[in-house]
A protein has these predicted regions:
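Elongated, amphipathic alpha-helical interaction scaffolds
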Residues: 1-260
Length: 260
């Protein structure tokens, strides 16, 4: 128990576990987004940490924090400690999932919601020593800016360039850094989780949730592997296996294809 407390006390907002708990606070998310999106008047209506967006025919995703803004747009905030994978393609895919998930069957294209993906990195994603990077759409032939409602923002949490973004990111990556004057919500939530028993209990409950989720995924994976084995051996058809096990037939087919 002592070791667990020490470990949780060493966590920072850039860590997935602490961010997952801090993102339950709408005020924290609003404070962060006002800085990252450079909009002091921004208002967050709702924030959902670990928001699941599904693709019935392909890869789904669990977003670190999906925030709905007062103007009707959405911001997906991701924290990334390790430089792995293609961040730009990840941003594009996550934005497409949110767009599809929040657009109704009869909605007109002009009513498709604006979506922003903001990825906070504990490394410099583009190597230019900037605290903030914006990926914009530009009409190649004229140089004019285009706007299809998608925005991408990449944050270098290690930059120390004197900007407000850099000052906020110092709280994200340095354990003992606080700034109650400029970032009261971030500072108070961080202090609560790191230094109080109530905060440690909150993070401990999330750890238990994560452990339970992992066990459930393991059981589901084992069940699917068993079903695929029966189908490969010709003991049962895909449709019959799906019906008896309560598993989607397409999911079985995808698993079989992946095992070939």
């Amino acid at each position: 128990m002592v070791q667990t407390r020490l470990d949780m006390g060493a966590l920072k907002p850039i860590d997935d576990l602490m961010f997952r708990v801090m993102a339950q606070s709408k005020d924290f998310c609003e404070e962060v987004l006002r800085v990252l999106l450079e909009d002091p008047g921004l208002t967050v209506v709702e924030c959902t940490p670990q928001s699941a967006v599904t693709n019935p025919h392909g890869r789904s995703a669990v977003l670190d924090a999906l925030c709905e803004l007062s103007g009707g747009g959405f911001v997906d905030v991701e924290v990334q400690r390790v430089d792995e994978g293609d961040l730009q393609r990840r941003a594009r895919y996550y934005a497409s999932l949110v767009t599809a998930d929040r657009t109704g069957p009869g909605d007109r294209f002009e009513d498709v919601p604006d979506v922003c993906v903001a990825i906070v990195c504990e490394f410099d994603p583009f190597g230019a020593a900037r605290s903030l990077y914006h990926m914009d759409r530009v009409l190649r032939e004229t140089g004019e800016a285009g706007d299809n409602g998608l925005a991408e923002v990449y944050v270098n949490a290690l930059a120390r360039d004197g900007s407000e973004v850099a000052a906020l990111m110092r709280l994200f990556v340095e354990g003992d850094a606080y700034d109650d004057a400029r970032f009261p919500e971030t500072s108070s939530e961080k202090r609560r989780l790191r230094e109080t028993e109530v905060g440690r209990m909150a993070m401990g409950s999330v750890i238990e949730e994560i452990r339970a989720e992992g066990e459930a995924k393991g059981e589901a994976k084992g069940k699917l592997e068993t079903i695929c084995g029966f189908v490969r051996d010709g003991l049962v058809s895909v449709q019959d296996a799906a019906a008896s096990a309560g598993v989607d037939a397409d999911e079985i087919r995808r698993a079989l294809a992946a095992q070939r």
